[in-house]
Amino acid sequence: MDPEVSLMLLCPPGGLSQEQVSVELSPAHDRRPLPEGDKTITAIWETRLQAQPWIFDAPKFRLHSATLASSSPEPQLLLHLGLTSYRDFLGTNWSSSASWLRQQGATDWGDKQAYLADPLGVGAALVTADDFLVFLRRSQQVAEAPGLVDVPGGHPEPQALCSGSIPQHEDLPGELVVRELFSSVLQEVCDEVNLPLHTLSQPLLLGIACNETSAGRASAEFYVQCSLTSEEVRNYYLSGGPEANESTGIIFVETQRVQRLQETEMWAQLCPSAKGAILLYNRHPPLQSGAGKSHLSHPSVPALSLQL
């Protein structure tokens, strides 16, 4: 296993649909206050703001743990989520004391992630109609992994479920959180690759990977099938999109080559989130044989409706 990434959860072969995932959102799953208080988080944030005044804080979902039950008639996954923020991420996972915080969390709570923000990300193993996986070269201007190769992705947003107010646990029903989780990965594909929503399948959750370069921050990785060919996808990408500034180029890799991608020079160019997505994708042979194409959605499916 690559030291930059670890696998927290592998879903059953073929992945899980939205209907097979549920969420328990509770303050019990939030980050623990730091042993000496959160003043260091505030100081780190203020320093970062001085250097990069364009950044802004935003609430995020925090992944505490996940429970997979192999029940009949089909497996069910329960995600235990709390709330956190981008500010707390910079002050914990991304801070110079992250390793110490993990050690202290293990000592104090029996959980090395207890003091870390751990905002949950999403990523897409996006496969074209002619069987290519889609990658993006990240811009040098982005905060994380500038210049490296990534899969389309981002974060589910608590704010999307309660616009105009600060999200509170009791205001976020589990069913809506699950919908935001699955729809957010489609939103990221639409925004970053500039693809029409109706060309994308319903996402299938492959598993959860952890970025060890940011102290184990987790990302839910999905399989998404596109009804367009790689050339058509390239043309849409080159015509620009809402987040075109986040990447500088698009890369296509044949799905049959992805199994051995770790043995190629390209692997060293992948950021940890992309490595996690590929490691999980490679553990789902049914999807590599084309079974996922049966999940192509219709644009009228309510669960996939997005505000573009």
From Swiss-Prot:
One GO term describing the cellular component: nucleoplasm
Motif interval(s): Nudix box: 174-195
EC number assigned by the record: 3.6.1.45
Binding site for Mg(2+): E188, E192
Entry cofactors: Mg(2+)
Binding locations of substrate: F56, Y86, R138, A143, D150, H155, E157, S273
Domain Nudix hydrolase: 117-284
InterPro entries: NUDIX_hydrolase_dom (IPR000086), NUDT22/NUDT9-like (IPR055295)
Ranges annotated as spanning the membrane: none
UniProt keyword Metal-binding present: yes
Keywords: Hydrolase, Magnesium, Metal-binding
Catalysed reactions listed for this entry: UDP-sugar + H2O = UMP + alpha-D-aldose 1-phosphate
Recorded GO MF terms: GDP-mannose hydrolase activity; metal ion binding; UDP-sugar diphosphatase activity
PANTHER family in the record: URIDINE DIPHOSPHATE GLUCOSE PYROPHOSPHATASE (PTHR31835), URIDINE DIPHOSPHATE GLUCOSE PYROPHOSPHATASE NUDT22 (PTHR31835:SF1)
Role of this protein: Hydrolyzes UDP-glucose to glucose 1-phosphate and UMP and UDP-galactose to galactose 1-phosphate and UMP. Preferred substrate is UDP-glucose.
Family: Belongs to the Nudix hydrolase family.
Protein name: Uridine diphosphate glucose pyrophosphatase NUDT22
